Amino acid sequence: MEKFQGYSEKHKSRQQYFVYPLLFQEYIYAFAHDYGLNDSEPVEIVSCNNKKFSSLLVKRLITRMYQQNFWINSVNHPNQDQLLDYKIGFYSEFYSQILPEGFAIVVEIPFSLRELFCPKEKEIPKFQNLRSIHSIFPFLEDKFLHLDYLSHIEIPYPIHFEILVQLLQYRIKDVPSLHLLRFFLNYYSNWNSFITSMKSIFLFKKENKRLFRFLYNSYVSEYEFFLLFLRKQSSSLPLLSSGTFLERIIFSRKMEHFGIMYPGFFRKTIWFFMDPLMHYVRYQGKAILGSKGTHFLNKKWKWYLINFWQYFFSFWTQPRRIHLNQLANSCFDFLGYLSSVPKSTLLVRNQMLENLFLINTRMKKFDTIVPATALIGYLSKAQFCTGSGHPISKPIWTDLSDWDILDRFGRICRNLFHYHSGSSKKQTLYRLKYILRLSCARTLARKHKSTVRTFMQRLGSAFLEEFFTEEELVFSLMFTKTSLFSFRGSHSERIWYFDIIRINDLVKPLN
């Protein structure tokens, strides 16, 4: 019992950080601007009349924030607030982006300090030798080959921004900072109603990438905290009530509502969490929960997650967002691949002295294939081919130089071939390569008002072949178990995070 109470207190320590005064420091906004320039994804810092970052604009912003009635008017009159009103002429677009970016940097400071002052624990291993996207498959083959069921989870988003603010109250006790966060979120939505339009969320995500990532990571870490804790303490669960270690701010009130639906839930032993072979993988807003348990056990996990999101985060998630499949009879979509674990029969001939034996051995093999239909459909949408896969020219590129046309087609072809070359069947890759090569030739022929045959005879097919087979730096990833909100001691569990440094753009629409 003392162990669980100490665990709760451990995560409540070092919360009294007052970070609000840092918003009045100029260097914070310089950091925010440098982050926008050095980010792996281009972040456009816009301003009125296309003005660039200026320390003078930041000083004006800080001067206005010192005004006594500035934030009061901003909250009471969000449609006419002094920060975003164009009638003032103080570069309102610049302020509306640079201030949330600076705020995101400030609120990240308590989490960085917590990581610095935490006692040194056992070093968390990092698999630095796995530097290729193709390392996923031997990794999954080693971990998932002996599992029976797989749950594919689409992690839901909270439909009300107030939920995200309440989650941060556990970690940040600086009340002015939380009120300022409400002010930012209030600008993008009607505060008294639920956000049912994805346009509002998309707008917030596009203009405030760092702040959106911070809020999303805090939400995911909170839900994973309970998932990992239940997984880690599964050996002790039959002895204690889960109410002992499910303590959180506001959660005690929601336990009552949960008890109405499931009376006696916290008094009974939750034995169904016990599973010695369970793996959890999160990537791109999705998660995979693999288990060797029974179908009944996995359904228990599914409904636990659904009710947990409903009664703890106060929003309903549809059961269809969690797909439960048996590995032997189905395949699953993972990072642009269709993966499966089919059973195959291997005939082994064994001879002992003069006797000959034939032994049939059933084996499992982790198989990965390229989704040909989806990729051809995406190329068709990008106007490289027809819906049936017939190559066509791309007229909008005919105004470019020959080298730019070759470079664009070459990059797409190499990226596709490198990323999907981990497939066990290469026929689809060669078909995609043929489509892009012929589409490139037809685009160049259309530009020079010639036929493909005449153009290829003049240019030579060897040049295209050499160009498309040119080597390029392959995408990198590493398997790590660290994160900003990592669960202490989780490195001894089967919890894996795929830290993908760069990913193929053509994979995103397929997911």
UniProtKB/Swiss-Prot annotation:
Going by the UniProt record, its keywords in alphabetical order are:
Chloroplast, mRNA processing, Plastid, RNA-binding, tRNA processing
Per the record, its GO cellular-component terms are: chloroplast
Q: One GO molecular function term?
A: RNA binding
Compartments, as annotated in UniProt: Plastid, Chloroplast
Q: Provide the primary localization.
A: plastid
- Signal peptide residues on this chain, from the entry's feature table: none
Q: What InterPro entries does the record point to?
A: Domain_X (IPR024937), Maturase_MatK (IPR002866), Maturase_MatK_N (IPR024942)
In which domain of life is the source organism classified?
Eukaryota
Any Pfam family the entry gives: Intron_maturas2
User: Could you give a single Gene Ontology term from the biological process aspect?
Assistant: RNA splicing
Q: Which PANTHER family match?
A: MATURASE K
The family this protein is said to belong to: Belongs to the intron maturase 2 family. MatK subfamily.
Q: What does this protein do?
A: Usually encoded in the trnK tRNA gene intron. Probably assists in splicing its own and other chloroplast group II introns.
Name it. Answer: Maturase K
Source organism per UniProt = Agrostis stolonifera
Q: What is the lineage of its organism?
A: Eukaryota, Viridiplantae, Streptophyta, Embryophyta, Tracheophyta
Could you tell me the gene encoding this protein?
matK
